[in-house]
Amino acid sequence: RRQFLAKAAGEPHDFTAAFDELRRGVDLSLNLAYNEPWGQMQPVRHILGALLFEQGHIEEAEEVYRADIKLWKDNMWGLLGLKLCLEARGDAPEELAEVTKLFNERSSRADIVPAKTCFCAQDALAKSCCD
């Protein structure tokens, strides 16, 4: 529901309300009961990070991805987001190399290696596997 509200709130140039809905969605997702298969189709944190990154909020996107990696140790999606943030910053080559190595290991068995942490990002499909 929060993802839907965020999409509905996303005006062409002001994503403040959309980001607020996604942040609330992240908070709510932390209290979901554990189940397998996972009850979320798309983790809200991955959506928030991708859209923050896309809108140039690199530092906050990086915080989102670091929190995701802390919660779900070295997961491919969190590592991808952190890798993109570190590439954009360009000031941490050693950490970028380490994160890239981990991402490559974690994504080595994926059918499709994603370019973004959410295909909802505007340029996610432009750089996809299927071009």
Regions found by a protein language model. Give the residues of each.
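Single-residue signature of alpha-solenoid repeat helices
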Residues: 18, 61, 95-96
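Terminal, low-structured helical/coil segments at or just beyond the last alpha-helical repeat
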Residues: 93-131
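"A position-specific structural signal for the A-helix of alpha-solenoid helical repeats
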Residues: 2-4, 47, 81-84
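Structural motif corresponding to the intra-repeat A-B loop/turn of tetratricopeptide repeats
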Residues: 5, 12, 55, 89-90
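TPR-repeat structural position
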Residues: 15, 58, 75, 92-93
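Amphipathic alpha-helical segments of tetratricopeptide repeats
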Residues: 23-31, 67-70, 104-108
